[in-house]
Design a protein with these regions (language model features):
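Acidic/polar, glycine-enriched structural segments that form the non-catalytic walls/loops
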Residues: 2-187, 204-208, 215-222
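Extended ligand-binding clefts on enzyme/binding-domain cores
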Residues: 23-54, 143, 179-191, 197-204, ...
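Aromatic-rich carbohydrate-recognition surfaces in CAZymes
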Residues: 78, 101-127, 184-328, 347-361, ...
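Well-ordered alpha-helical scaffold segments within catalytic/enzyme domains
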Residues: 87, 135-142, 193-205, 292-308, ...
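Extended, well-ordered alpha-helical scaffold segments
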Residues: 115, 151, 205-217, 285, ...
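Aromatic-lined, polymer-binding surfaces characteristic
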Residues: 149, 153-154, 160-168, 187, ...
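Active-site-adjacent structural elements in folded domains
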Residues: 173-182, 276-284, 307-311, 332-349, ...
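Terminal, non-catalytic domain-edge segments
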Residues: 493-530
Length: 530
């Protein structure tokens, strides 16, 4: 069903389902089967199949309504140049722990017709601003090196489009990602973390919008751990973390299993009491997520975001840094964000994340005027770094403690460098990146020694570690080749084989915002000493 709406100087044709079941299911690899689709121009039509055939064969535009025929939208302009608009109205964008939230544009009572009117009226200005942004981006990318602009173009819109921007009823901003093609979680902390270079560079308040949901869920009784959560549910339902739910086959856990690419509506796990024991501790990412939250919060404020969010959630941050103090130097057998590689004990990259997380907490304390505590944690970070050097020795940092002839991309060093602490040291950064170049394959350096697959976002984080432009280009150059030559013609896949160039999995994900790491470094926005 559908119709045509007369507007100011143009018309908008639309169609919709006979029954619009908003937010009726949720899963990865599933698109909404609700909402309205619009096509607008000077003249617009809703045509039956017979009407479309008449237009294509004779150029006649006539309203021909026939039941049980396919419907088509048609929009035409009679001049040589004109403007066409397409729009999708999802009615409701997100369920957020009991609140039904519309998209950000609709937050003050506006609707889809207001959006069309705004877009027509502001079209020239919007295009002009976009063109100016493109020119500036191209100029900035050329300073980074040859081919880098290609990666930026492939990353920017994909990363932004993998989020939904909404506002809670009390006016708090939420910028919620969908973990596309890797399980469909909403607001995943370790998906936000790799993406943040893009948002720190252009709008750090969006990083705060990523953090807010994790803070809110961490305060709920059902989350009874002393480390940070992984996610908020399955997009578009913030109904409680779905990752690592208990796999017991009993009457308390039935129906909690997360299934991939199977449309469903999740249970309201966020309502459950602490006694429910909903989550398996062994399937969480404790050091990973604590470090992520601390680093993201410190980076957001450093880049210019408001510090009140950190103030409101300081007790959580203080608890998470305590966890890193106790368990970060020698991580137990656990998962990290690269969970496809499985559990790993003594993960050196996780230890680096713990170190940077402790540094980040000292920064947060400094921003909040807690000078004594800031000094205390700066000293703790230095002590931690000294102990880390003793454990790893003077060689290339291994994949895990005791590992001989192993390596992994130590992307977690990045914010130690960007903040300006340099507790790891530039000598280590240069040695690591030189080694990565030696190990690089046709389409990039492998993520670690276990497999030949890699991650594009982490390669670009690594490229930002070196101050040598040629080395930076040598690291990201194979990613440019991958984008041009991969046989997997899909939206930018971030997890792929470094030798063959075909994807393993993971397409269309927000994490490619991390490809802006070299630009973020060049901006100096996260350097506290700037």
């Amino acid at each position: 069903m559908g119709g045509v709406i007369p507007m100011k100087g143009y018309e908008a044709a639309y169609f919709t389902r006979g029954r619009n079941l908003v937010l009726s299911d949720t899963s990865d690899m599933c698109s909404p089967d609700w909402g309205d689709i619009y096509l607008a121009a000077k003249e617009s039509w809703l045509l039956s199949e017979a009407g479309l055939t008449l237009y294509l064969s004779e150029g006649k535009r006539e309203y021909l309504r026939k039941d049980c025929e396919r419907l088509y939208l048609l929009a035409v302009n009679t001049e040589q140049k004109g403007t066409f608009l397409t729009a999708f109205d999802d009615k409701v964008s997100v369920f957020y722990f009991g609140e039904w939230l519309k998209c950000y544009f609709f937050r003050n009572g506006k609707n889809i017709l207001d959006a069309l009117e705004f877009s027509f009226a502001e079209y020239a200005r919007i295009v002009s601003e976009c063109e100016a942004f493109d020119e500036q981006l191209k100029s900035d990318c050329e300073k980074v090196g040859n081919g880098y602009y290609t990666i930026a173009c492939a990353s920017l819109r994909q990363s932004v489009a993998a989020h939904k921007l909404v506002e809670t009823k009390d006016g708090k901003l939420l910028f919620l990602s969908k973990e596309n093609n890797s399980n469909g979680c909403i607001g995943t902390a370790d998906v936000s973390y790799p993406s943040i270079p893009l948002y720190l560079l252009y709008n750090p308040e969006l990083v705060q919008g990523m953090l807010r949901g994790i803070y809110d869920f961490a305060k709920m009784p059902v989350w009874n751990f002393d480390f940070a959560p992984h996610d908020l549910g399955t997009y578009p339902w913030c109904s409680g973390q779905i990752y690592g739910t208990a796999q017991r086959d009993d009457k308390y856990c039935c129906g909690m299993y997360s299934t991939w690419a199977s449309p469903r509506t999740n249970q309201m796990l966020y309502l459950r009491p602490a006694e429910s024991e909903v989550y398996e501790k062994n399937m969480q990412m404790p050091v990973e997520e604590c470090g992520n939250m601390l680093i993201m919060q410190a980076a957001a404020i450093t880049a210019g975001a408001d510090k009140s969010l950190a103030e409101e959630n300081f007790s959580l941050l203080a608890g998470w840094v305590k966890y890193l103090e106790g368990f970060g130097l020698s991580p137990e057998n656990q998962l990290c964000t690269d969970d496809f590689a499985g559990h790993l004990a003594g993960n050196v990259n996780l230890t680096v994340k713990a170190l940077v997380g402790i540094e980040a907490f000292s920064l947060i304390c400094r921003f909040l005027g807690k000078e004594e505590l800031a000094g205390e944690y700066e000293n703790k970070a230095r002590t931690f770094a000294d102990a880390f050097r003793v454990k790893v020795g003077p060689h290339i940092l291994p994949l895990s403690y005791g590992g001989t002839d192993t390596f992994s991309i130590k992307y977690n060093i990045l914010f130690d460098k960007l903040f300006g602490f340099s507790l790891i040291g530039q000598e280590v950064c240069e040695a690591e990146t030189a080694y990565y170049i030696q190990k690089s394959n046709r389409f990039g350096v492998p993520l670690d020694t276990r497999e030949d697959y890699t991650k594009a976002d982490w390669i670009l984080w690594a490229a930002a570690l070196t101050d040598d432009k040629e080395k930076c280009e040598a690291l990201y150059g194979p990613v440019v080749n991958y984008l041009a030559q991969t046989p997997s013609r899909v939206p930018f896949g971030d997890w792929y084989y470094s030798t063959r160039g075909d994807i393993v999995h993971f397409i269309n994900r927000s994490v490619v915002g991390g490809c802006f790491a070299p630009l973020l470094k060049a901006s100096g926005k996260c350097n506290v000493k700037r």
